[in-house]
Every structure is written in C-alpha cells, then in structure tokens.
C-alpha cells in the first residue's frame, strides 16, 4: 500500500512553494481586490463592496493580472515574505490559512477541483460588487461589508 502524500500546502512552507503552487493558493474570491478603508482611531481595516477598476465583477478575476501594477500602482502583491502581514486578508483566504498552518476549506478549488465552488458557496462577492467608478470615494463608507481580522 502506497503512503498517503500530503498536499503541497500542508507539507511545504510558503517559502518552499514554486510560483505555480503559490498562485494556485488563490481561491479566486476577489475579496483582496475590494477597496478598503482604515479606521484612523484603531487602524482597523474595513472591506467595501467596491471593486478595483481591474476586477471583473462576475468572475472576480483581474482583467489585466500580469500588468496590474502598471494600471493600479498601489495594488498589493502578496508574497511568501509578507506572510506576517496577511491578517488583513479574509479568514477564508488560502494565503492566510496556509501562512497560519491551517488546511484549505472544502470549497477551495485545490481541494474540490471546482474553481466555481468559491462562487457557489458565496465566499466571493460575485454579483454583489460595485464598480470603482460608480461610487464617489467620499461615499465608500456607505458600502462597508466587513472588518478584517
């Protein structure tokens, strides 16, 4: 009987992942691409339902991922070296979970094999986001959906 091989996200550290493994941790929820507001009093980060101008509102995928930082200079690039900063990511985020030594959820495409499960389980904001250009920045506070952490 062959020994069971643990999935790469269990048996490897973030630093040991190759680029394809790293990218595959993304569940495609798009939550990290929502505009966020920071409370000046306690530094809490709040997610809005307002999507980055490059985020496809239905698929929750970046429309220009390879060149995103050219169009959106403040786009945050997640890397294994920044894992200690992942607390602002949603608790369901594959990057955050693996950085905390946790397993991926059953709906994650690496576990279930279905990239649409994140939408079927309503983890993503697909169909519930607003385009960045449709809401004045001073009105973003009216569209808060949850607090990070």
Curated annotation (Swiss-Prot):
InterPro entries: Puta_zinc/iron-chelating_dom, UCP006173. HAMAP family: UPF0260. Belongs to the UPF0260 family. This is UPF0260 protein PFL_1499.
């Amino acid at each position: 009987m062959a020994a069971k091989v643990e999935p790469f996200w269990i048996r490897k550290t973030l630093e040991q992942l190759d680029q394809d493994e790293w990218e595959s941790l993304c569940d495609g929820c798009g939550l990290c691409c929502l505009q966020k507001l920071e409370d000046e009093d306690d530094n809490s980060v709040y997610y809005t339902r307002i999507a980055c101008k490059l985020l496809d509102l239905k698929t929750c995928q970046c429309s220009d991922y390879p060149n995103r930082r050219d169009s959106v200079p403040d786009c945050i690039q997640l890397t294994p070296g920044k894992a200690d900063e992942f607390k602002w990511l949603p608790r369901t985020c594959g990057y955050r979970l693996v950085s905390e030594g946790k397993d991926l959820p059953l709906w994650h495409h690496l576990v279930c094999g279905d990239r649409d499960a994140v939408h079927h389980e309503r983890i993503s904001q697909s169909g519930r986001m607003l385009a960045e250009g449709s809401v004045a920045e001073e009105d973003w506070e009216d569209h808060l959906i949850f607090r990070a952490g």
